[in-house]
């Protein structure tokens, strides 16, 4: 679901900016699971690699 993936991405960015990286990782991972071939998943994977 692209809409849910976008929401997850947006929420992940918010958590990341607040310094709550464990919540950001959880949401970015969910984005990849929900829509693995979307641009949202690509961006989420990039952020996951930057956090770790």
Give the role of each language-model region.
Residues 1-4, 31-43:
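Short solvent-exposed coil/turn linkers within tandem alpha-helical repeat scaffolds
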